[in-house]
Amino acid sequence: MSTAGKVIKCKAAVLWELKKPFSIEEVEVAPPKAQEVRIKMVAVGICGTDDHVVSGTMVTPLPAILGHEAAGIVESVGEGVTTVKPGDKVIPLAVPQCGKCRICKNPESNYCLKNDVSNPQGTLQDGTSRFTCRGKPIHHFLGISTFSQYTVVDENAVAKIDAASPLAKVCLIGCGFSTGYGSAVNVAKVTPGSTCAVFGLGGVGLSVVMGCKAAGAARIIAVDINKDKFAKAKELGATECINPQDYNKPIQEVLKEMTDGGVDFSFEVIGRLDTMMASLLCCHEACGTSVIVGVPPDSQNLSMNPMLLLTGRTWKGAVLGGFKSKECVPKLVADFMAKKFSLDALITHVLPFEKINDGFDLLHSGKSIRTILMF
């Protein structure tokens, strides 16, 4: 029996309040309005950004259905939708691509003005929600809310992908892999023969390592306080791995001594102010580029001496690795299908969706890189 045009009742993980476990609830998902798409989710990854919301580091309206790194199949479409149809395999896009705003028209940027990151409303682009639970509206997250068996997204926030692609793997292209890999190849523009330092070896950090290797870096120094992550980092391309706790001097000084004054490219992939500064300081004062990849704590500021930049350093950041989402995600999936890169090393655990809280426990313990939840 077709569900098109009808309210769907399904299971979703609702975050009712900060620093509490997710609650598996029955929610009602309204049909898509014009220019919207309803998706049946198949696989979703647990990303550190979701955990930043739970901890209060990243602010979004609650109660909400989180999740933003996923893949699924189109269930139905609203009026006027032309880029996807029911049955298509798709990846929802946490950063949309409307194609019309000044940012979408700028070849150097991907931070579409339709995003729900800068000033999160917790709704779709028309300002309303498609979710209700216990008779109350539930907020969306980044416009896609993938911790639900069904979700509704705007058409400019979904990309059709290869019909043969394995959704349990390519879901990582929705955030973690693209964010890390693109930070190296698009944002920093790592050059052949260069020296790189990567702070933080979670799924995104390891994807940065992969990007640095693909770009031809000669040295890739991986930095983490969890030495259990070093073997995987070396497998993916790190040439050296160091633990700041093994030294009695600041890690930026260690890195500068190792690299004749500083690395060419550094990446902070944790989301801490102290490591953002260490990452900046470890890149060469005359020619180094440091990229902020990790989501910083809300409402906290860094203070720094502008002389650090005057001498020639570049300090920059980007979301989703600088990729224009709707056009680049399908290309990345095609590259994966062509075996240009593998995602297997990033996936350490696969759990049923109902065990979402166990997946977050694995993240907190440092035992997982990426946990995939299957619906």
UniProtKB/Swiss-Prot annotation:
Its cofactor is Zn(2+). Its EC number is 1.1.1.1. GO terms for molecular function: alcohol dehydrogenase (NAD+) activity; all-trans-retinol dehydrogenase (NAD+) activity; butanol dehydrogenase (NAD+) activity; zinc ion binding. Zn(2+) 1 binds at residues 47, 68, 175. Zn(2+) 2 binds at residues 98, 101, 104, 112. It catalyses: a primary alcohol + NAD(+) = an aldehyde + NADH + H(+); a secondary alcohol + NAD(+) = a ketone + NADH + H(+); butan-1-ol + NAD(+) = butanal + NADH + H(+); 1-propanol + NAD(+) = propanal + NADH + H(+). InterPro entries: ADH-like_C, ADH-like_N, ADH_Zn_CS, GroES-like_sf, NAD(P)-bd_dom_sf, PKS_ER. Its main location: cytoplasm. The modification N-acetylserine is found at residue 2. Gene3D superfamilies: Medium-chain alcohol dehydrogenases, catalytic domain (3.90.180.10), NAD(P)-binding Rossmann-like Domain (3.40.50.720). Binds 2 Zn(2+) ions per subunit. The modification Phosphoserine is found at residue 23. Dimer of identical or heterodimer of closely related subunits alpha, beta, or gamma that are encoded by genes ADH1A, ADH1B, and ADH1C, respectively. This is Alcohol dehydrogenase 1A. It comes from Pongo abelii.
